[in-house]
Amino acid sequence: MDYFYVDIETELGEMLTYYVAAMNEAHAEELATIAFENGEIECMGIQIVSIYAYRA
C-alpha cells in the first residue's frame, strides 16, 4: 500500500483533495469516489466532474 492524493472537481467547480492509502492510482480514485458517494467528503457538489490520483 502507498499513499495518494486524489484531486476531485465537482459540478459546482469545487476542487477537493482527498488523502488515501491504496495499491495504485486507479484504486485510490475508486476509494475516493466511494468516500464521496458515501458523504465522507464534505462539499456542496453532488457529482464528480473529474478525478485524478497521484502518489503522495
Spell out what each predicted region is:
Residues E14-N24:
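A short, exposed loop/beta-hairpin motif centered on an aromatic-Gly-Thr core
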Residues Y3-F4, Y18, F36, Y54:
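Aromatic side chains
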Residues I34-A56:
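Short, mixed-charge low-complexity intrinsically disordered segments
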Residues M1-M15:
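Short aromatic-glycine-(Arg/Gly/Cys) micro-motifs in beta-strand/loop hairpins
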